[in-house]
Amino acid sequence: MAHSKEIPSFRWTQSLRRELGMFTEPTKSSVLNDAKLIADSLDFTQVSQVQRLLRKSKRGDTDLDKLRDLNKEVDRLMSMKSVQNNTVLKVGDLGKDELMDLASDLEKLKKKIGDRESNSPRMYMGNLTQSQLEKRAGILRTLGFQQQRGAAGGVVRLWDVSDPSKLNNQFGSMPALTIACMTVQGGETMNNVVQALTSLGLLYTVKYPNLDDLEKLTLEHDCLQIITKDESALNISGYNFSLSAAVKAGASLIDGGNMLETIKVTPNNFSSIVKAALNVKRREGMFIDERPGNRNPYENLLYKLCLSGEGWPYIGSRSQILGRSWDNTSVDLNARPVTGPRAPEKNGQNIRLSNLSEMQEAIVKEAMRKLDSSDTIWMDIEGPPTDPVELAVFQPSSGNYVHCFRKPHDEKGFKNGSRHSHGILLKDLEDAQPGLLSYVIGLLPQGSVITVQGADDIKKLFDIHGRKDLKLVDVRLTGEQSRIFEQEVWEKFGHLCRAHNGVIVPKKKNKEANSTKEPHCALLDCIMFQSVLDGHLPDTIPIQLLPNTLVFQAKSAFVM
């Protein structure tokens, strides 16, 4: 029986490529145009917030609204998208046997995907016997992998939302978005990202790239460090840097490779594509495996094709499509709906100006006078003491804080710190007010005691600024202790800082440790450390003492 055979997954992929090659188009230029527009126009503070909520173990309606709003903005910026075009296939489009075959496969696919989404996240079973599955589980335990456990009934509800249908079509990765995020959040040039992903795409023409391949390619393409080594769970992939998202992006950059990812569906060719897919299915003995697990190549193709009758089924934006494949493609009815318009927009950029004026100095002095030297004052920095890029001074009793930034001199060292620690992107410091950080340090109350987590860097910073009068109290929390309230602080106070939009990549020597993926923000770290000492989040509302128009310089409308 065909269903008892091991699925030759890559052979199926190659067969589908050969059969459907006539329906592919060069996509590199369009993907890069969309990627550039997303990189220039999207608010990456919102991207960081969505990436943060996707890391939560449980997400609700508010989280889903944020994801959907961001997906809507991405869809607006993209020219490569799928549009709602519910398709009805009838005799004449396909033969009667083909229509029955298609209807049967869509029904099986509906059952498979429905079963997977109603149960806990699972691994792809393939066609393993029970004894093989048990042996695999033992191997994974030996290697240190933890099995995901559900509640009493074995159900893990990653999304606890009032209307589950709103989850539909919100999670597929898109090459243009992947490239834009790797460029902006990784602090890379788009050319470097494209070259790295092209290497992955070329490898994908002969095999499925795996983590070993990724590690070797990373030696040549440093920007691939951003790709996560973790296995993606169900319904979190949209903005995650998974290997599968990177491979898909690479495939879209390989013009002339007959990649399935570059198929374009139109109302005129839809039935022909489905007919060709059914032909190769019969020839190769492909089938819908109804057991829960990841989709095999045929299942993946069928689902994507039948979701929308027009657009780019693999690589386009489809977040605005309503319904599922079995809702949007049907058999023996007689209707063809209309398609919607598409209209990307363009944006401009800006420049920055001068140093502190007398009026600005007066504003900073007035702000610093509001700090009570007799009460606890926290301070934290990001970047080395010889080249700091962020400084925060926070007084828990009043909630008053001063938060400022500085453009680094050592851009190479900064990039390393961004990738492994603070996640600040150089472009977000272009307009930081020069001289402000040092001026704030000079105005700290004479002889005051500053509370810190790790005193060495702050002491060196004070020495450089001639502030030997200031005393330090180091709370000396362990790394794990200091991060106890990390998720809650980012959830409640993350809106206070919009500068940490990069992706954090754990250092190689820390890979085995449970290292955080949240960026280190000087201000939020101060709040976090005080929360550990208090055992709860602050009761006071944080108040920024400096206006944002002083922390960052005014931007010119255009360049002469």
Curated annotation (Swiss-Prot):
InterPro entries the UniProt entry points to: Nucleocapsid_arenaviridae, Nucleocapsid_C_arenaviridae, Nucleocapsid_C_sf, Nucleocapsid_N_arenaviridae
GO molecular function, one term: metal ion binding
Keyword terms of this UniProt record: Capsid protein, Helical capsid protein, Host cytoplasm, Host-virus interaction, Hydrolase, Inhibition of host IKBKE by virus, Inhibition of host innate immune response by virus, Inhibition of host RLR pathway by virus, Interferon antiviral system evasion, Manganese, Metal-binding, Ribonucleoprotein, RNA-binding, Viral immunoevasion, Viral nucleoprotein, Virion, Zinc
Enzyme class: hydrolase
Cellular component aspect of the GO annotation: helical viral capsid; host cell cytoplasm; ribonucleoprotein complex; viral nucleocapsid
Protein's cellular compartments: Virion; Host cytoplasm
Primary site of residence: virion
Chain positions covered by the region annotation Binding site for the cap structure m7GTP: 54-236
Residues binding Zn(2+): E390, C497, H500, C521
GTP-binding keyword on record: no
Record Pfam families: Arena_ncap_C, Arena_nucleocap
Record's subunit section: Homomultimerizes to form the nucleocapsid. Binds to viral genomic RNA. Interacts with glycoprotein G2. Interacts with protein Z; this interaction probably directs the encapsidated genome to budding sites. Interacts with protein L; this interaction does not interfere with Z-L interaction. Interacts with host IKBKE (via Protein kinase domain); the interaction inhibits IKBKE kinase activity.
Task performed by this protein: Encapsidates the genome, protecting it from nucleases. The encapsidated genomic RNA is termed the nucleocapsid (NC). Serves as template for viral transcription and replication. The increased presence of protein N in host cell does not seem to trigger the switch from transcription to replication as observed in other negative strain RNA viruses.
HAMAP family, per the entry: ARENA_NCAP (MF_04085)
Protein's name according to its UniProt entry: Nucleoprotein
Organism: Guanarito mammarenavirus (isolate Human/Venezuela/NH-95551/1990) (GTOV)
Gene name of this polypeptide: N
